[in-house]
Regions:
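C-terminal, non-catalytic "cap/extension" segments appended to globular domains
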Residues: 3-7, 14, 18-20, 138, ...
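A well-structured
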Residues: 1-313, 596-601
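Active-site recognition of the HExxH zinc-binding catalytic motif
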Residues: 253, 381-401, 422, 427, ...
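Short pre-active-site segment immediately N-terminal to the catalytic Zn-binding motif
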Residues: 316-321, 334, 369-391
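Post-HExxH zinc-binding segment in Zn-dependent metallohydrolases
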Residues: 414-442, 449-455, 529
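Conserved helix-loop functional segments at active or binding sites
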Residues: 330, 334-341, 367, 396, ...
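Catalytic zinc-binding patch centered on the HExxH motif and its immediate surroundings
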Residues: 317-319, 352-373
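Long, K/E/R/D-enriched contiguous segments that form extended
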Residues: 295-340, 399, 445, 450-456, ...
Length: 601
């Protein structure tokens, strides 16, 4: 039973800096400060700020070239330094020095926020199309700068944006860090069959996919005992983050937090509405599947929460790390190209930190590091789902390899589009298995796949409902633990319905998910990514050669073009609900296959 990190790999960043005491690291911190100071001086020297509309001049072109070049130069080095620090803060929240350095770097980086606001106002004043005629740098960065110009319509005054940039480090950023620290350091006592055991909360949550029903229930009970210990602190953090977001969104002229989120993700409201309509109409089908899963586990009615991630009784035993890698390696190899070598490159290069341990944050993510190299963060539990998560995060790493030749301003990805490659790679693993397996093995894989789809469609919908209500109520007052718990239960009731045993619903999901502790909705973009990824995979299956001819370029342009423009490359109209219905139909077909296989048992 994999519960803690023993022999699993950890990433190695010592080739970049040997330690925080290394001269190279100290120089990198000094350089970040110096680069920001030079940027501030350059913006003042060139008077980069809102101006009266007028015809552009060659001097404007020279100013734009200088500013864009300097911004990219700063980000090239600063992004590496930030990732290096994060490689410690995310894996060891007990490391107080790393936490302090993260805060120090954050204060330096925050000084660029008002500069970005000034650049947005300046570009909007003169026109990005007009500036592109006199500035090669603007022409090269037309997409990101056009979006920046649009952002200028939703900015506070220059002074206010500058003040907010200074305050955010001690406001929402600090609140989010608090949630990460208190939850990552939490432990729980689990009544395991061989006796009680104290485990990091990340390892406890990993037991949700354990083969033994008694262990799953014990882990759930331990969670319910543990989360109240940090709930009050997390409620304060939630109120701080959402309260700040409401004020800033209002001062920036956004009609709602959702409008701000859609803009940040380069997704239009018609696209979002089409997707949401398809999601809501799919909920009854998901509820039916959850009840079918419940029957296979011997339950009547809805599925208990503690069995949401339960493997089927005949599912394969625990997947070893090496076997999980082989599953991903084989699936990536079926696609070919540079993706085929992604697993070995990440393993050999020690990009991956795989196992849970005390002080390590929960979840999984991938962050770009140096050149086209990434750092892949996992909490491997030994489940089949862990293998799919590994494929997902290595998909992000592959995406980063396709972005590496772009400038930092060109490769800043909105979340919805950042999920494109990760979902596609996860789907490769699922489809390869479905083609290879039959009978009970096929049913077991469908079970894992559909529980993932249910998370991204149904659970994410519950998170969206919850967060929407939190934003609304936070406009009037702060929310306590009991109220947040009630909102979470109601959101789960509305999304899951009779698909789960509502008596076992998880009221503390808002405590443990870091996604809530940010200004924007950190939920619906996952649904976008899943359904868009399924649409891409269908295109790949129809014409693999044509798909491969466009895919890498689309990935490299994810920070440049809108969601609608990227979809159009493959002939998709994402403003049309039919696209989203077709993607959900792929999931429905898997539910049908699940039911047929279950009936044949």
């Amino acid at each position: 039973m994999t519960t803690t990190d023993d022999a699993l790999p950890r990433w190695d960043v010592t080739d970049v800096h040997e330690s925080f005491d290394a001269r190279t690291f100290l120089d990198a911190m000094d350089r970040a400060n110096a680069d920001v100071a030079r940027l501030e001086a350059l913006f003042d020297e060139r008077n980069i700020r809102a101006t009266d509309p007028r015809p552009v001049t060659p001097e404007d072109g020279a100013d734009a070239d200088a500013v864009v070049t300097a911004f990219n130069e700063y980000l090239t080095h600063a992004d590496i330094t930030e990732a290096y620090i994060a490689s410690f803060t995310t894996t060891d929240t007990f490391n107080e020095r790393a936490e302090g350095l993260e805060a120090e770097f954050g204060m330096t980086a925050a000084r660029t926020r008002p500069l970005t606001a000034r650049l947005a106002a300046w570009v909007a004043s003169l026109g990005v199309d007009e500036l592109a005629t006199v500035s090669p740098a603007v022409a090269e960065h037309h997409g990101p700068l056009a979006k920046l110009a649009d952002r200028a319509e939703h900015q506070m005054s220059e002074v206010e944006e500058g003040l907010y940039a200074e305050l955010v480090a001690t406001g929402s950023t600090a609140w989010g860090q608090l949630q990460g620290v208190v939850t990552s350091q939490l432990t729980a006592t689990v009544a395991l069959p061989d006796g009680p055991q104290d485990l990091p909360i990340t390892a406890v949550r990993g037991l949700a996919s354990h083969a033994d029903a008694a262990v799953r229930r014990a882990a759930y009970d331990a969670e319910m005992e543990a989360w109240p210990k940090v709930a009050a602190a997390c409620a304060a953090a939630m109120n701080g983050v959402k309260g700040e977001a409401n004020v800033v969104n209002r001062r920036r002229g956004w009609a709602s937090p959702l409008d701000a989120s859609l803009f940040a993700n380069s997704v239009s409201r018609p696209t979002f509405d089409a997707m949401q309509a398809a999601v809501v109409d799919s909920l009854p089908a998901f509820r039916g599947w959850l009840r079918a899963k419940a029957r296979l586990h011997g339950h009547e009615g809805g599925l208990p929460w503690y069995d949401l991630f339960a493997p089927l009784p005949f599912a394969p035993a625990e997947v070893t790390w090496d076997d999980g890698l082989e599953i991903v390696r084989h699936a990536f190899g079926s696609y070919g190209g540079s993706l085929a070598g992604m697993v070995d490159r990440a393993v050999d290069g020690r990009w991956i930190d795989a196992g849970p341990r005390p002080g390590k944050q929960g979840g999984a993510f991938c962050m770009p590091f140096v050149d086209d190299r990434s750092l892949v963060f996992l909490n491997w539990s030994g489940s089949v789902d862990s293998a799919q998560t590994t494929a997902h995060e290595l998909g992000h790493a592959y995406h980063n390899t396709q972005l590496a030749h772009r400038t930092p301003l060109q490769r800043a990805l909105p979340m919805a589009l950042a999920e494109t490659a990760s979902i596609f790679c996860e789907t490769l693993v699922v489809e390869e298995g479905l083609q290879r397996l039959q009978g009970k093995d096929r049913l077991a894989l469908l079970d894992v796949d559909l529980q993932g789809s249910a998370q991204v469609v149904v659970d994410i919908h519950s998170r969206f409902l919850f967060e929407t209500e939190v934003f609304t109520r936070r406009q009037r007052r702060t929310l306590g633990v009991s109220e947040l718990n009630d909102l979470m239960r109601q959101a789960q009731q509305d999304a899951y319905g009779d698909g789960i045993d509502q008596a076992t619903a998880h009221p503390y999901m808002w405590v443990l998910k870091p996604h809530y502790y940010g200004a924007h909705f950190y939920n619906w973009p996952y649904t976008y990514g899943l359904l868009f990824g399924l649409g891409l995979f269908a295109q790949y299956r129809q014409d693999p050669d044509r798909f491969r001819a466009h895919y890498d370029d689309v990935l490299s342009r994810a920070g440049i073009d809108s969601a609608e423009a990227l979809a159009a490359v493959f002939g998709f109209d994402v403003t049309d609900r039919a696209f989203w219905d077709a993607s959900i139909d792929v999931i429905r077909s898997r539910m049908t296959a699940y039911d047929e296989l279950a009936a044949a048992l």
